[in-house]
Amino acid sequence: MTEAMKITLSTQPADARWGEKATYSINNDGITLHLNGADDLGLIQRAARKIDGLGIKHVQLSGEDWDADRCWAFWQGYKAPKGTRKVEWPDLDDAQRQELDNRLMIIDWVRDTINAPAEELGPSQLAQRAVDLISNVAGDRVTYRITKGEDLRDQGYMGLHTVGRGSERSPVLLALDYNPTGDKEAPVYACLVGKGITFDSGGYSIKQTAFMDSMKSDMGGAATVTGALAFAITRGLNKRVKLFLCCADNLISGNAFKLGDIITYRNGKKVEVMNTDAEGRLVLADGLIDASAQKPELIIDAATLTGAAKTALGNDYHALFSFDDALAGRLLASAAQENEPFWRLPLAEFHRSQLPSNFAELNNTGSAAYPAGASTAAGFLSHFVENYQQGWLHIDCSATYRKAPVEQWSAGATGLGVRTIANLLTA
């Protein structure tokens, strides 16, 4: 085992020989990170990426200036999908160490799950991993039901069944109930709904290779809301919350759904399929119908839903949509407290009508006349939320995954969004 490289923090500028505005310097004792008070957490995260790039795989965070947030910023930049890294953490008080340990356990689970190859993480495996994580932190306060394959069709989950039937791996709906009250009749405070497309080829509206090569990550929304519930539980969540994960592959086969097919949902809505690569909204619709039936105060869905959100925000922000201004403000306040990037994009009544079909009530994709793809996707989902104008948040997870490394992140999943949603649930 190599000796750990000591990493210390300083508010003093680096020696001028390291260059103007140098953020780190190296001496016989190790590496010093020079904080300037402007974006200290970002500076630490970027420095950790550079340290990893130097091939340093064993570090000791040394000194009294480290706290849980600074340690976490370092780990966010230091962690990568290849190789092993060891961090010797500084002495923290019990509360901060517990917070850090919970982040390491749960958000690393989210990142590792999203990074997993589709071959090893199908719909059933994703659902079971979610059950295992929540059960690990909640124990007997959790019950769940898994519905799969033809049982989905028999029970009316036509969106999920339609999308997933083209794969040999059956589609799966996970319905998980976290009920810390012990009262089976306790009201449901919140419902979380996640898109769990474990691989998205685009179906017959097939993706090009450059757009398909990262589609193992199309279950990022499901992983994010699962992690958020687990993390909220570790922070003392004492209200009943239900989790719905809509898990499927979107593949091409003789049994796959086709353009022009019409899906009839349990709420009576008929949807014409004009793009099989707009499948996420089709599976989420089933989860949102179930969520609405619980009459919760709050519904949050999360999905890697549209390329349009990435076009608007890149991979730097999650896109937020809501008709409820007060609730959107609460989510953004939670994001600010957790230092996670969210940005609200437009969602108006007219977006709900920008999905015209000649054969059904709705089309599953907008036309060239209505190019606001992220907003029309949110508008589509609103048709499956009973009281869509209040208590509903839609998160288009554009910051979930990076195809290439940048100065703050390795390639792969980020885990962003988990803490924000957990913060909102426990506020």
Swiss-Prot record:
The keyword Phosphoprotein does not apply. Keywords: Aminopeptidase, Cytoplasm, Hydrolase, Manganese, Metal-binding, Protease. One of its GO terms (molecular function) is metalloaminopeptidase activity. Mn(2+) 1 binds at residues 200, 277, 279. Its cofactor is Mn(2+). It is found in: Cytoplasm. The gene is pepB. This is Peptidase B. The keyword Membrane does not apply. Homohexamer. One of its GO terms (cellular component) is cytoplasm. Probably plays an important role in intracellular peptide degradation. Mn(2+) 2 binds at residues 195, 200, 218, 279. The active site is at residues 207, 281. GO terms for biological process: proteolysis. InterPro entries: Leucine_aapep/pepB, M17_PepB-like_N, Pept_M17_PepB, Peptidase_M17_C. NCBIfam families: PRK05015.1. It comes from Escherichia coli O17:K52:H18 (strain UMN026 / ExPEC). Belongs to the peptidase M17 family. Gene3D superfamilies: Zn peptidases (3.40.630.10).
